[in-house]
Design a protein with these regions (language model features):
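Charged, low-complexity intrinsically disordered regions
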Residues: 87, 91-143, 147-296
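Core hydrophobic alpha-helical membrane-spanning segments
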Residues: 37-41, 60-62, 108
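Cytosolic juxtamembrane N-terminal segments of multi-pass membrane proteins
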Residues: 1-29
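Hydrophobic alpha-helical transmembrane segments
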Residues: 45-60
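Intrinsic disorder/low-complexity detector
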Residues: 1-8, 32-35, 49, 294-296
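Transmembrane alpha-helical segments and their cytosolic interface motifs
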Residues: 26-41
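Juxtamembrane membrane-interface segments of multi-pass membrane proteins
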Residues: 2-13, 78-94
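Transmembrane-cytosolic junction motif
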Residues: 25, 62-88
């Protein structure tokens, strides 16, 4: 494997992580087999004591314990992966990574007007690109409803949330709403028809000032947002507020975790890790916030 040499990034810990992945799979398999055999033995014992009605509770408890233990092993390996792989790739771009860091719910609410009672943020990449300070992270937001028998979870958003700063300050608020999202997006102000037909096909634009919207959404920026929307093939919405832009890409997945069903150290996997980080870091560079949007 030539993972260490790919793009000059030192990923020499991948082979050790792959050994841990294989060991975890073997351990999980043994736990399932032994747990199943144990349940059979104990259920037979309970039946001999005429306590067969306890079998159901034993089964539920056993499944819960196995699931929790195996999930713990998985999370431990993922944490090591983020520390030894994702962090190294991010630092190669001259940026910083915090596995437990993230943007706030208030940042999420800059774009979304959703009823949320469960959320978390993780895997924050932050720093400066081309004079633009930014933060981006994996963000999850959902509404949990407690019913009589079970809890229903409605996922409102799961994807990348980005916050970046630019040098000029706007006197208006501008919302760029993906047309595939028919609800939960903020859309204050009046509808603004922009001069880019392709942009208008993908987005609805709302603003508190029509002139400011055309000042902020330059032809270059509209083209870049359209390109990003096509590239990720997922709902993308944004808001311009004072000297900040917030972007949400609803990918419906965690973006910085490995596929533990595949070898961690294969060249294909390594290329995917690098491309995964690169795709999101390049968002800031592609937008060219402090280069092409507003002239001094």
């Amino acid at each position: 494997m030539q993972a260490d040499e790919l793009k000059g990034i030192d990923l020499s810990d991948l082979d050790e992580l792959e050994k841990e992945r294989l060991a975890m799979g073997q351990k999980a398999f043994k736990m399932i087999v032994y747990g199943f055999l144990g349940i059979i033995v104990v259920s037979g014992f309970l039946a001999s004591l005429h306590l067969g009605n306890l079998f159901f509770f034993l089964l539920i408890g056993g499944v819960f314990y196995l699931g929790k233990t195996i999930n713990g092993l998985k999370n431990e390996l993922i944490a090591k992966f983020k520390q030894k792989v994702v962090s190294v790739i991010v630092k190669n771009y001259g940026l910083n990574f915090s596995a437990n860091g993230g943007l706030s719910l208030n940042d999420f609410y800059k774009i979304y007007d959703a009823d949320v009672n469960r959320h978390y943020a993780e895997d924050m990449i932050y720093g400066q690109i081309d004079e633009t300070q930014f933060k981006l992270c994996d963000f999850y937001a959902a509404k949990e409803t407690q019913g009589e028998k079970r809890t229903t979870t409605t996922v409102k958003f799961q994807g990348i949330l980005l916050k970046a700063e630019f040098k000029k300050e706007l006197n208006a608020t501008i919302y760029v709403c993906d047309k595939k999202r028919t609800s939960d997006l903020r859309s204050d102000g009046e509808l603004a028809m922009m001069d880019n037909p392709k942009f208008n096909e993908l987005f609805k634009t709302y603003t508190t000032d029509q002139i400011a919207a055309r000042y902020a959404l330059t032809p270059k920026l509209m083209e870049n947002l359209t390109t990003l929307r096509t590239k990720f093939n997922a709902p993308l919405s944004a808001v311009f507020l004072k000297n900040e832009i917030f972007i949400a890409i609803d990918l419906r997945k965690d973006s910085f975790e490995p596929d533990l069903k595949k070898p961690i150290n294969s060249n294909e996997s390594v290329q995917n890790y690098i491309a995964g980080v690169s795709d999101f870091v390049e968002i800031v560079r592609d937008l060219e916030l402090n280069k092409n949007i507003w002239k001094s």
